[in-house]
Amino acid sequence: MPDDRKEKTSEADARAVAEFIHGAFYSPQARARNTPARIEFSRLTQRRYRESVADLLSGFAETRQTERSGGLQAEYFQSKGMNKKDKSALQRIDPIVRFDFGTNSPTPDITADQFSIAWSGSVLAPESGEYQFRVTTPNGARLYVNTDLAAGDSNRRDDSDAKREVALVDLWVSSGGVERQGSGALYLLGGRSYPLRLDYFKFKEKTAAVRLEWKPPHGPWTGIPSSVLSPDGSSATPIIGTSFPAEDSSLGYERGHSISKEWWRTITRAGTETSELVAERLPRLAGLPADLTNRTELSRRMQDFCAQLAERAFRRPLDTELRHRTVDLWFQPGVALEDSVKRSVLAVM
């Protein structure tokens, strides 16, 4: 009421009006009623996304994890020309790979002019991030990390035409005994073991030496400590290498609370990379026999695999509509089966 007409209202009326206004606009119930809860999207952080892809694909193949630490399994060979591993002379566990043999042989049972050493086992990544690996030698060496090795990767003969995988570091062709360094980088998920193999040889050079180092996330170059090396083998883990946008850590921890155009572009690239990983490993992941050539049967098995992958990714059985959108839609006559699998995986991701 106007100040000059106060007599027109009573204290009871004023109280009733105030209670009504407070209840209608300012009380907790009113604020909740007048400001409905907003639906917000959330997403996986980049670390959780990579872990989800790794777990999803690893679930389709037999996996091995290490049980011991203390170094790598080493086997020393006498070489003979093209045959780098003509005769095994010594097997032992080497805590680290940092040797300077000079003009001597590593063991009395092999000659100093030509020999080879194979170190194999696993390396444990203490944290998630990009790891760099470096090999230093005046001789020849190849380093493989987190790779499913092919027959040719035993590096027994230089004239072998067996299939090889691309080495992370390849210094196989020496340069007149001059010391060289080679390095490579890859993203590893923390808390997991990854297969590691280093093949090294000397052939007629004056001296022999080899050193294996790494640069973990947030750390300097250093020798790989024996505490993270194991003589046991482990299974390669499929890890996507797509670069993700920075996460929001304003609350003290990473959280995925915003879905931007940049994020959509990133997960599209990540989904494409995941489909490539699946295609590379398809026979093993889908359990396809090497002698199976019938297209109808291959298509059926691949569709079953894609449906199983989708169910695991969505954590629920597929209904008819969802199976059509993620699997059946992509397997059409005239389309290569591998391309159909890639499109199905991309749709799921």
Residue ranges, per PLM feature:
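Glycine- and acidic
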Residues: 2-3, 34-35, 117-122, 177-182, ...
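Aromatic- and Gly/Pro-enriched helix-to-coil junctions and flexible linker segments
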Residues: 1-66, 234-288, 311-312, 317-319, ...
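Residue-level detector of secondary-structure boundary/capping sites
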Residues: 8, 12, 40-45, 68-72, ...
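Primarily short, surface-exposed interaction patches in extracytoplasmic proteins
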Residues: 190, 291, 295-349
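A generic secondary-structure signal for well-formed alpha-helical elements
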Residues: 21-29, 48, 56-64, 127, ...
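Acidic/polar, compositionally biased interaction segments
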Residues: 63-257
